[in-house]
Swiss-Prot record:
It comes from Flavobacterium johnsoniae (strain ATCC 17061 / DSM 2064 / JCM 8514 / BCRC 14874 / CCUG 350202 / NBRC 14942 / NCIMB 11054 / UW101). It catalyses: Random endo-hydrolysis of N-acetyl-beta-D-glucosaminide (1->4)-beta-linkages in chitin and chitodextrins. It is found in: Secreted. This is Chitinase ChiA. InterPro entries: Carb-bd-like_fold, CarboxyPept-like_regulatory, Chitinase_II/V-like_cat, Chitinase_insertion_sf, Glyco_hydro18_cat, Glyco_hydro_18_chit_AS, Glycoside_hydrolase_SF, Glycosyl_Hydrlase_18. The lineage of its organism: Bacteria, Pseudomonadati, Bacteroidota, Flavobacteriia, Flavobacteriales. GO terms for cellular component: extracellular region. Disruption phenotype: Disruption results in cells that fail to digest chitin.
Length: 1578
């Protein structure tokens, strides 16, 4: 897969010209892997136009001191990196997750360099021992190089070692509930870091190598070696020797650890002795840190990049004094159970008591959605908002340190942060010091929403600004007059030190903000080029149009061409490099010479002359660097033969078809011309396979093989008839000639938030054909327009040009276009001799089929039948070419059998002359169509109307008639909510006025306009709207109460527990002053929460109905009452549908999928699935603990709005048929992590609400990816007591134990983990491998079913020690299923998984090949494995033998992904479920056994064997169909009885063996009956 992926990337990577920074500085942005979770900041949201480099952070390392050679990179979150599919990542993408998004980001911004950052604060502890070991650092560097081969869009690696020698973690910090290991040190860390970088450079000579250096002003000269300090440590090389650039932390100078307010990132020292960062000789600041790196360590300025923070620090408990909160005591919190004092709560801090960061990000300060809000700044001005100011917040700017801060003396809080002002000053500082650029930590911290990327935009703007008093130098690099692309330009000072570097993609360069009055020199660097430096003296004004000239040497390839010893003239020798081709022709002496081969390029040299071959066939010179001599020898004359012919579509020539003759090592090709002819000249004696190809077409013959070609051949092809499955397709012609390359535009309207307005272009092929894939119109119901725009088609007009506002066709429909105005499409065209409309009364009928039948007229005009299909407006037409040459029409009609058995009138249009002028022939379902009124309500049209009390609303309707005859309008009645209104008429425009009373506001109203015609026909239209009051006279609007929870007011409880009651109360013209609840004899105040919610926790005391009265009072004493009833009921044994004895379980999709179409649960009634899992419950914003049911909203609409009751009814329809419906939590996108008891309780209560509301029969645990990491790799006691030390593990177990206990034993609990997390534990136990085994072990009594997914994640070792992967098919199923029943020791942990009873185990397989990435078995292969496991009966190819204890006759059945895939075309119309159903049905053999009395009318049917023939008789009805299956579900006989008799005798070779058959008999009345029949051969 990885090799395929790399090839795919290299082939598809587009050469795009996209936006990139215009300045010459580097802008390095760190992106945190975890940003996809709470932050919801996925990679596609990164603005690559403002960055030059992106550091993806972080990767860790695996290091074993005993085996340093195994040191490798370590992915820290496989779900984030490679598994998630957020943002529409294709399910079949070769890599998913952030790495897919990084690839797409690179495609969007080709200039952007993407690096993997290794280490970080919590995952760099092993960098010290790795760097100290020559073997380990070489192994790590080699793994990095391999990583880039696999993912070629990665440009290098960044080492974030925090920190060499000193600093970093101390082992007391807690992250995600676990202590972070302490940083490891070696006295030689500083030297070993250089050696690690050297190993990386050697392994990746052409890739980027960088580091992130620390911020400790007093220590960095010891921690990092550069040109100025390396000698004192005995080094002749340093970090800058091997790094492309060096970033350094420009933040975390000050923080809460000082228990005193200070700055996170001061640009300059404060000079204040009270500042914790102050030092008499050396303070902590960016300026002093930069001086250390430049002057003490000696890093070149053009390699040094300064860090820029997008975050700051918060301090609480700030002591009051006169410094506005600055440099005063701010002690942290002392929290029981925490080793360290705790910081204030930061932007994204979770509920962990000992995990507070105090970190405040700019996105938080400007009010963007975060976990813990500190919204004090206006996002436009970045000044304090009025509400924050009124709460006591004040912004200060320290002009000494050049940073802002916020202080609230009332709350005693202080926040150090960065804004646009401080960011600009930091960037100006970078420019003034001639540093290489700025580094950002971290991109997801920037502002979002309506004003995104404020700080990143400021960085870009500031780098592009000109510093007053400076000069710039700009120009280009050229070779002659041509620009030299992809060239490096260096700017040096008078001391010849490089001060700035630019890599120019197009050859142009610019250096800005240079000190005036200095001497500068410029030169360029590029392999194989020689450049002349340019020197500029005393530069006091801007220098433009500076040209650096370069030259590139050229070389010659020469030699002779001989036939034996005889010179050969006239031979063309060609040297090719990319698009460059150089040639020479040999002279009479056989000599040739090709000059001008550019140095450094790769050239392929060949010789050619018609009828001859030459040796060598080709010679490649890679990176040519000298003159070359190459001689050729001419071979024997080559005789060529032709393969030629024509390609026709019926009798029409087909142009543009590529005919290819393939042979070992290559191919020859020709393209058919306008006459459809082609000709291939092929060397004799070869073996060729000849095929024809044209996009979207197939041809007969598919291929023809010529072996040892020794004569000319004629080979004609016929284009096959291809029936388009596209709903919208057609042809574009100029008269009768197809138009290739025409652009057809389809415009679709905004439909919902996921189906926006869009325009899609289809381009015609060589045959003038176009089509739109059905995915283009999926989710849309209407087409705004379908046309060819003249401005896109050479100013040529195509007709029709009025295809607009029609419904998306349900079936494939052809829309043709032509340059002639008489061109015909699915719309009627008046110029056609025969056209018309088809209607049902006055309603157009789309998709109706109109047949014209023409008689035999002469030898060129035979009898023919042609169909026209109506468009969305019911229009049809026949092109005049259809009737050309005919004088008579046999019939024109709509056949009932082609139109759903509907009769259309007239039905007697027959034997009439072909009209000579365009004539309309209309059809209707009604024999006589009465003229009817037509009502249109024209005003108002808004769904909400706001007026003042005393104002009137004027209703307006237009009333006409459907046809012009003697019929008139006799009356028009306006009624509002059933009450008539006075009406006025003016020329068919009717009006009525209504002045609402005070009590009619804040309500919904419906206007009905009914018109009656003189013939008694009527038409009515309605208009619904809500009325609100707006103005001085408005009465008080009462509060509105909405019931939230419990959503299902029947609450099932085994014991009395709290029932949370929640409502929403809002007041449109004021505020809600209070909400009360009266229940169980008492009245209580409800607790106000966010978003106008009010809650009350009610604990029942009896199983009964509890009336509930909720009253909301507004600020004007207006009261609204809401009544409801909560029923507390026991969990009865019949609340949940029990599992069947033999199970076929399928997952049902809650989304659309073109390959596996959506199915309603009602459609599953009667299918072979007897248990169905609803997919899926996920968690809100992937928080890991707040369940939310995914729903296919567009499938359950009422008046265009999702109606959950329709979904409930749909689920109920399947449950009513006796099939349990279980809801599955997780899936590929369902992220579940329960870090603490609070999250566990939210999770359990959320699942209860979903289960109760939708009446699910149980819950299925389908955790995948990151949800399977329980941080329990160190577990060594699998018991319940043992898992208690691992919160994630214990909380999951407790959650499902609580659900089972709450609902009782009838509640179904199932699980469907992947093999990695179950059988993977046999050989390896880590945080993920085998991670689900403790869950199964501790839920073994609660679990009803376990179905380990034997697909996608690959195979594992079986109990016999052999590896069983998907290639071993049936043997993999038997081996891995045997494991979960038998049990096994868990790796080398000393723990044991005890296995589950076979009655709780399902085998789990994909329904068809497309349903999973791997693991598909045919029904026969799967049933072979199941039959062996259940009975011990062997199968062909079996290599695995069950362990003692098998077989397992109680093995419960099959789970499959999914019901939808099984029902799809991929699933061959439910082949899998039918086969397993037949297998289970076959397990109780009987000579003749009725399985299923499908219809009472078929009780006279008998099936039995006589003389090895199957006899089927029915005394009452003729037999229509007999189908016979074997026990594997394979169809042996499908006999359609055309004799209309009551007895059928069938013969089949399979009947001659003693076995059991399933016979399904269908009679003429459609009744079915199925039998098990055994041929006992007697």
């Amino acid at each position: 897969m990885k090799h395929y992926y790399r090839l795919l990337f290299l082939l598809l990577f587009p050469l795009l010209a996209s936006a990139q920074p215009a300045h010459g500085k580097k802008v390095v942005g760190y992106y945190a892997q975890w940003s996809i979770y709470a932050r919801d900041f996925n990679v596609p949201k990164i603005d690559g136009s403002k960055l030059t480099h992106l550091n993806y952070s972080f990767y860790g390392t695996t290091y074993d001191p005993a085996h340093p050679e195994n040191t490798k990179l370590k992915c820290l979150d496989t779900y984030a990196d490679f598994e998630h599919m957020e943002g529409g990542i294709p399910w079949d993408a070769p890599v998913k997750g952030n790495f897919y998004d990084l690839m797409k980001l690179k495609q969007k911004y080709p200039h952007l360099k993407i690096l993997i950052s290794v280490g970080g604060w919590t995952k760099g502890q092993d960098l010290s021992p790795i760097a100290a070991s020559p073997v380990a650092r070489a192994a790590l560097a080699a793994d990095m190089a391999n990583f880039i081969v696999t993912y070629p869009f990665i440009d290098g690696f960044d080492i974030d070692w925090e920190y060499p020698l000193s600093g970093g973690t101390d082992g007391t910090e807690i992250v995600n509930g676990m202590p972070v290991p302490p940083q490891k040190y070696s006295p030689d860390d500083n030297k070993n870091l250089v050696l690690l970088l050297k190993a990386m450079r050697q392994a990746m000579p052409n890739k980027l190598v960088t580091i992130a250096a620390g911020n400790n002003v007093r220590n960095v000269s010891k921690q990092y070696l550069g040109p100025n300090n390396r000698a004192q440590y005995g080094m002749t090389e340093d970090i800058s020797t091997y790094c492309d650039y060096i970033t350094y932390f420009g933040y975390d100078f000050g923080g809460n650890w000082y228990d005193k307010t200070c700055y996170n990132a001061p640009l300059y020292a404060s000079g204040n002795p009270n500042d914790p960062l102050y030092g008499a000789t050396q303070s902590e600041s960016l300026d002093e840190l930069t001086n250390q790196y430049l002057n003490v360590i000696g890093f070149p300025a053009n390699k040094l990049i300064m860090g820029l923070p997008f975050y700051g620090k918060k301090f609480d408990n700030v002591a009051a004094n006169s410094t506005n909160g600055l440099f005063v005591a701010a002690p942290r919190y002392i929290v029981p159970g925490c080793t360290n004092p705790q910081n204030p709560t930061g932007t994204w801090d979770g509920s962990g008591a000992c995990e507070k960061s105090g970190s405040i990000e700019i996105c938080d300060l400007v009010g963007n959605p975060v976990t813990n809000s500190h919204a004090y700044l206006d996002p436009n001005t970045m000044m304090v908002t009025p509400s924050a100011a009124s709460a006591g917040w004040v912004r200060y700017f320290d002009n000494t340190t050049k940073v802002p801060y916020l202080y609230n003396s009332t709350l005693k809080q202080f926040i150090s942060y960065e804004d646009k002002q401080s960011m600009d000053l930091k960037v100006q500082y970078i420019k003034s010091r001639n540093l290489a650029g700025g580094m950002i930590w971290e991109l997801s911290q920037d502002t979002r929403g309506s004003i995104p990327n404020s700080l990143l935009n400021q960085v870009d703007t500031s780098f592009g600004s000109v510093v007053p008093g400076t000069v710039s130098i700009s120009g280009s690099v050229k070779n002659g007059s041509a620009l030299v692309t992809d060239v490096t330009v260096e700017l040096r000072n008078a001391s010849n030190a490089v001060i700035q570097t630019v890599v120019s993609a197009n050859g142009n360069f610019a250096f800005n903000n240079l000190t005036s009055g200095q001497n500068y020199s410029l030169t360029a660097l590029k392999a194989t080029y020689t450049f002349t430096p340019v020197t500029l003296v005393n530069v006091t004004v801007n220098q433009t149009a500076v040209v650096i000239n370069g030259t590139q040497p050229t070389y010659t390839v020469s030699g002779t061409v001989l036939d034996g010893s005889t010179p050969v003239s006239g031979v063309t020798v060609t040297a090719v490099s990319g698009s460059t081709t150089l040639t020479a022709v040999s002279n009479a002496s056989g000599v040739y010479s090709i000059a001008g081969l550019t140095a450094g390029l790769n050239f392929t040299v060949t010789a050619a002359k018609s009828g001859f071959s030459y040796a060598p066939a080709s010679t490649v010179y890679n990176a040519i660097d000298s003159n070359k001599t190459l001689n050729f020898t001419q071979g024997a004359p080559v005789v060529n033969y032709t393969v030629s012919g024509t390609v026709l579509n019926s009798t029409t020539p087909v142009s543009g078809v590529t005919v290819t003759a393939s042979f070992t090592g290559g191919s020859y090709a020709a393209v058919t011309n306008a006459s459809g002819t082609y000709s291939l000249s092929l060397p004799s004696g070869g073996n060729y396979t000849v095929t024809a190809a044209l996009t979207g077409q197939t041809f007969t013959p598919a291929s023809t093989v010529y072996s040892n070609l020794n004569a000319n051949k004629t080979l004609n092809f016929t284009q096959d008839v291809v029936v388009s499955t596209s709903k919208i397709s057609g042809t574009v012609k100029n008269g009768t000639n197809p138009v290739a390359g025409a652009k057809v535009e389809l415009v679709l309207p905004w439909t919902d938030n996921t189906h926006n307005w869009k325009s899609v272009i289809a381009t015609t092929d060589a045959q003038g054909k176009y089509s739109f894939d059905n995915s283009v119109v999926d989710g849309y119901t209407q087409v705004l327009s379908l046309k060819l725009n003249s401005w896109q088609n050479g100013e040529v007009a195509y007709y029709p040009n009025n295809l607009a506002n029609f419904a998306v066709p349900a079936n494939p429909t052809v829309y043709n276009f032509n340059t002639s105005s008489t061109a015909k499409s699915a719309l009627a065209a008046a110029a056609n001799l025969i056209s018309g409309t088809v209607k049902n009364g006055t309603t157009p009928v789309a998709g109706a089929k109109v047949e014209i039948v023409l008689p035999w007229t002469d030898n060129t005009h035979n009898w023919k039948s042609v169909l026209a299909t109506t468009d969305a407006s019911g229009n049809y037409s026949f092109d005049n070419s259809v009737v050309a040459g005919y004088t008579q029409i046999l019939s024109l009609k709509l056949n009932g059998w082609e139109n759903g058995d509907v009769t259309y009138y007239p039905n007697n249009l027959a034997n009439f002359a072909v009209p000579t002028t365009p004539t309309i022939y209309n059809f209707n379902r009604q024999a006589v169509v009465a003229t009817k009124p037509v009502v249109t309500i024209t005003a108002p049209t808004a769904s909400a109307i706001a007026i003042n009390l005393g104002s009137a609303i004027n209703f307006v309707a237009s009333v006409g008639l459907s046809a012009v005859d003697a019929t008139t309008i006799s009356s028009v009645v306006f009624s509002l909510d059933g009450q008539s209104l006075s009406t006025a008429n003016s020329s068919g425009t009717y009006t009525a006025a209504w002045t609402p009373a005070a009590n009619q506001f804040s309500l919904s109203h419906t206007l009905t306009v009914t018109a009656t015609a003189s013939n008694g026909t009527t038409d009515s239209k309605t208009y619904s709207f809500t009325l609100t009051c707006s103005g001085a006279n408005c009465p008080n609007a009462l509060p509105v109460i909405t019931w939230n929870s419990p959503s299902n007011t029947t609450v099932y409880q085994n014991t009395f527990q709290v029932v949370p009651i929640s409502v929403t109360a809002v007041d449109s013209d004021g505020t809600v002053s209070g909400v009360t609840i009266t229940i169980n004899g008492g009245t209580f105040n409800m607790t106000a929460g966010t978003n106008n919610t009010y809650t009350y926790n009610f604990t029942p005391s009896a199983y009964q109905d509890y009336p509930v009265v909720i009253k909301a009072t507004d600020n004007k004493s207006g009261v609204t009452t809401l009544n409801n009833t909560i029923k507390i009921a026991t969990v009865s044994t019949n609340r949940f549908i029990p599992l069947p004895s033999k199970i076929i379980l399928g997952y049902a999709h809650s989304w659309e999928n073109a390959g596996a179409p959506f199915l309603y649960f009602s459609q599953m009634v009667g299918s072979k699935f007897n248990v169905v899992d609803y997919s899926f419950v996920e968690t809100v914003n992937r928080d890991g603990y707040t369940p939310i049911l995914t729903t296919n909203d567009t499938r359950y609409l009422t008046n265009g709005v999702f109606n959950k009751q329709l979904l409930k009814n749909d689920i109920k329809s399947l449950r009513d048929s006796g099939v349990p419906v279980i809801v599955s939590i997780g899936g590929q996108n369902g992220h579940v992590v329960l870090d603490n008891v609070t999250q566990k309780n939210i999770f359990v209560n959320g699942l209860k609400a979903i289960i109760d509301e939708y009446q699910f029969d149980g819950v299925d645990i389908d955790f995948e990816g990151g949800s399977m990491n329980f941080n329990a790799g160190g577990l060594r006691d699998i018991s319940y007591a043992g898992i208690s030390a691992y919160p994630r593990l214990k909380n999951v177990v407790d959650a499902f134990k609580e659900l089972k206990a709450y609902y009782g034993p009838g509640f179904l609990l199932t699980a469907a983990p992947e093999t990695q997390y179950v059988q993977g534990g046999y050989t390896t136990y880590t945080d993920t491998f085998g991670s689900f085994l403790p869950i199964i072990q501790n839920l073994r009594n609660e679990l009803d079913l376990l179905a380990v997914q034997l697909y996608n994640t690959g195979g594992e070792n079986g109990l016999d020690g052999q590896y069983y992967g998907t290639a071993k098919k049936s043997n993999m199923v038997t081996a891995l299923t045997d494991m979960v029943i038998k049990g096994y020791n868990i790796a080398s942990t000393g723990m044991r998984f005890d296995g589950l009873p076979a009655s709780k185990v399902l085998i789990a397989l994909p329904a068809c090949p497309s349903a999973a990435g791997s693991g598909y078995l045919t029904p026969t292969e799967g049933i072979n494995a199941m039959h062996y496991l259940r009975t011990g009966t062997t199968f062909s190819g079996r290599t695995y033998t069950m362990q003692p204890g098998g077989p397992y006759p109680s093995l419960r059945g099959l789970m499959t992904w999914s019901v939808n895939w099984d029902a799809s075309s991929c699933g061959n119309s439910s082949e899998l479920s039918k086969a397993y159903a037949a297998y289970f049905a076959s397990q109780t053999a009987a000579k003749t056994l009725v399985l299923d009395d499908i219809s009472a009318k078929s009780n006279a049917t008998i099936a039995y064997f006589k003389n090895n023939a199957l006899s089927v008789t029915n005394e009452n009805e003729d037999i229509a169909q007999v189908d016979v299956f074997n026990v594997l579900g394979q169809n042996l006989v499908s006999h359609r009885n055309v004799q209309n008799n009551k007895e059928v005798l069938l013969h089949n070779q399979s009947f001659s063996s003693k076995q059991l058959f399933l016979v399904v008999v269908t009679d003429k009345a459609g009744n079915k009956k199925s039998f098990k029949v055994m041929n006992f051969l007697n």
